[in-house]
A protein has these predicted regions:
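Active-site-proximal cap/lid insertion segments
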Residues: 2, 10-26, 137-356, 369-389, ...
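A short aromatic-rich beta-strand->coil structural motif
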Residues: 6-12, 88, 100, 216-219, ...
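Non-transmembrane alpha-helical segments in soluble domains
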Residues: 11, 33-37, 60, 85-89, ...
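Active-site segment of extracytoplasmic enzymes that catalyze sulfate/phosphate-ester chemistry
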Residues: 15-99, 107
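Short, solvent-exposed loop/turn segments at the edges of secondary structure
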Residues: 54, 114, 333-337, 392, ...
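Catalytic-site neighborhoods of secreted/periplasmic enzymes
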Residues: 63-188
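C-terminal cap/loop subdomain of S1 sulfatases and analogous C-terminal strand-loop tails that border
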Residues: 126-129, 143-145, 315-321, 361-363, ...
Length: 503
């Protein structure tokens, strides 16, 4: 094979449930279908901490939150931890980051520096919308600058008070501008949007990388994360006859439900599900067009045959399923199951893989694609200042993408949340074990638990945790969760000092 390349596309808050509904006819998504036809769609891929920063840290490191330390929003990933971009950079690859990475807190800076993690080129724009994209809008599309400012929700960030080299007070300017809410169409053309700008920068990186130079291009889109704001003209590509209605909030009558559910339900009640889903699906259509541009750009650059394309999301969005919205510690399917598509040289085409995958599998998958040593799940990796590193939780998915399932492939994935934006109480901490046909979630401080037989109850409506007829089922799932916690909490002594026969 010629020099390999990797394009990693990370969508923000894109649930597998909604992409699959779109592909069944709810939205016009020819390029997602195109990528699925060129590779493998993993139908059971899970976010192991369904919130932005922790999930993205797991993608980068192959570790779960309890190992890499990014527990929730507001945490920064240590640049000392091994990452796939760092490994590829050390191996001589050109490494480019375009769009959203969110490995550091948004409030830290409008222009975060991700070069310490291993990127040699970066074009960053994230949720606060300041920085490179905003500066480009002002320079190239000044007629839309004020319209863009109306969509900035993080107006209280200090940097907006002394913005840019001229130290302009954009905060004062924005204070006089209306905000459009949480469901709207962008008040400027699609060509000016963050998503288009991110794709433009990625295409520039692909086109400008010299032939023969291996390229890693990570493309991070800010959408379809709320606010649900597609460009104008894309709602017409949504066929509402195929958009599913929200599943009922059966937890309201369940005494084992944690209190945090009520707080999030109060947020959800302010939204009308038809409007939310229509705008969300329209944003998927816009992202589909960006995917098509990326795939075409690889072909134009002569890199199509030698490039692994990996597309996934950090977590999902409930979109009013179960009377809830967004993500966090509500481990229903639309929150934790994410789309994952992988195509590349030597991989199966048009395949659907039902084996369990997790976002921490991306790290070893990229290393194997690059021909670099791939850590085993039981292999420690050195970290500066520490004699040993945490277990690598991920496994390469390339064997599955070739159509072969290893005999020792996992039978469960583990999901954790440590708090959410509604509360920091341990009662909102939750540990979940998810198998192919069951889910068990245990909340902290006795706040509640959930047990679902997904084969009989795919919509997760009947909590069996307190049902005496399912006591054995509950115990089996609790034991599976306990075994995971025992292994994950294995102490990290200085084993490099150990010598056989020394006590």
């Amino acid at each position: 094979m010629a020099t390999p390349n990797v394009v990693l596309i990370v969508y923000d808050q894109l649930a597998a449930s909604w992409l699959e509904a779109g592909l069944r006819g709810a939205a016009d998504l020819p390029n997602f279908a195109r990528l699925a036809g060129q590779g493998t769609y993993f139908s059971r891929c899970f976010s192991t901490n369904p919130v932005c920063s922790p999930a993205r840290a797991s993608i980068a490191t192959g570790l779960r939150s309890s190992a890499h330390g990014v527990m929730q929003l507001g945490y920064a990933l240590s640049p000392e931890l091994p990452t796939f971009m760092g490994a590829l950079s050390e191996a001589g690859w050109h490494t480019a980051a375009c769009g959203k990475l969110h490995l550091r807190p948004h409030w830290e800076s409008l222009e975060p520096d991700y070069r310490p993690y291993g990127f040699s080129e970066q074009h960053i724009t994230e949720d606060p919308r300041g920085g490179a994209w905003l500066d480009w809008v002002r320079a190239e599309h000044p007629e839309h600058f004020r319209a863009v400012l109306t969509t900035i929700w993080a107006r209280e960030m200090d940097e907006f008070s002394e913005y840019g080299p001229q130290r302009e007070n954009l905060a004062e300017l924005m204070a006089g501008l209306p905000m459009p809410g949480n469901v709207y169409e962008l008040p400027f053309p699609a060509r000016v949007s963050q998503s288009n700008w991110i794709t433009d920068r990625a295409l520039d990186s692909i086109a400008s990388t010299p032939p023969g130079q291996s390229l890693l291009c990570q493309i991070g889109y800010v959408q379809p994360h709320n606010p649900y704001a597609p460009p104008r003209g894309f709602r017409r590509f949504v066929n509402f006859d195929y958009v599913p209605e929200p599943v009922p909030a059966a937890w309201r009558d369940d005494p084992l439900t944690p209190p945090a559910f009520n707080a999030r339900a109060a947020v959800a009640e302010k939204h009308e599900w038809r409007a939310v889903r229509e705008h969300y699906f329209a944003d998927m259509v816009h992202l589909d067009r960006q995917l098509g541009r990326v795939l075409d750009g690889l072909a134009d650059a002569g890199r199509e045959r030698d490039t692994y394309v990996i597309a996934l999301a950090d977590h999902g969005d409930l979109l009013l399923d179960h009377g809830l919205i967004y993500k966090d510690s509500f481990h229903y399917d639309a929150c934790v199951r994410v789309p994952l598509l992988i195509s590349g040289p030597g991989l199966a085409q048009g395949q659907v893989c039902d084996d369990l995958a997790a976002i921490e599998d991306i790290y070893p998958t990229i290393l194997e694609a690059a021909g670099l040593p791939c850590p085993r799940p039981d292999e420690r990796r050195p970290v500066p200042g520490q004699p040993t590193a945490p277990f690598c939780a991920g496994r390469s998915l390339l064997e599955l993408a070739r159509g072969r399932t290893p005999a020792d492939w996992r039978e469960a994935v583990f999901i954790e949340s440590f708090n959410n934006l509604d509360s920091r109480l341990p009662g909102n901490w939750v540990k979940t074990v998810r198998t192919a046909d069951a889910r068990y979630s245990l909340y902290g401080e006795g706040a509640g638990e959930q047990l679902f037989d997904l084969a009989a109850d795919p919509d997760e409506q009947e909590n069996l945790a307190a049902d005496p007829t399912h006591r054995r089922f509950r115990q089996q799932m609790r034991d599976l969760l306990l075994q995971h916690l025992l292994v994950e909490r294995y102490p990290h002594p200085p084993r490099d000092l150990f010598r056989l026969g020394v006590h």
